[in-house]
UniProtKB/Swiss-Prot annotation:
This is Large ribosomal subunit protein uL18. It comes from Hydrogenovibrio crunogenus (strain DSM 25203 / XCL-2) (Thiomicrospira crunogena). This is one of the proteins that bind and probably mediate the attachment of the 5S RNA into the large ribosomal subunit, where it forms part of the central protuberance. The lineage of its organism: Bacteria, Pseudomonadati, Pseudomonadota, Gammaproteobacteria, Thiotrichales. One of its GO terms (cellular component) is cytosolic large ribosomal subunit. SUPFAM superfamilies: Translational machinery components. Part of the 50S ribosomal subunit; part of the 5S rRNA/L5/L18/L25 subcomplex. Contacts the 5S and 23S rRNAs. NCBIfam families: L18_bact (TIGR00060). One of its GO terms (biological process) is translation. Keywords: Ribonucleoprotein, Ribosomal protein, RNA-binding, rRNA-binding. One of its GO terms (molecular function) is structural constituent of ribosome. The keyword rRNA-binding applies. PANTHER family: 39S RIBOSOMAL PROTEIN L18, MITOCHONDRIAL (PTHR12899), LARGE RIBOSOMAL SUBUNIT PROTEIN UL18M (PTHR12899:SF3). Belongs to the universal ribosomal protein uL18 family.
Amino acid sequence: MDKKATRLRRAKKTRAKLGSQDRARLCVHRTPKHIYAQIISSDGSSVVASCSTVQADIKKQVAFGGNKEAAELVGKSIAEKAKAAGIESVAFDRSGFKYHGRVQVLADSARENGLQF
């Protein structure tokens, strides 16, 4: 198995466990240049809020989207958007990525700004 297939297998197992919970899901995806976060409704049918380093307001604040500073801004922004949509508590879906580095910084930033995991 290659790295991508292994990551997708881990993500599938995680989503199977998260699917049984009746909470919205904070789904994170990272690439070498950007990081993306989405809050998906508890039934999985719609995206309630989304944020990424591709968006103009965040792109203005950071020089490069693939670092921890950018992940911190995305975490703060997604927490604010979740609060505006009336979501206080989410399940964290790291999409098979290790809870380390940019993924961890995004999660910590979202927690600091009022989102409960």
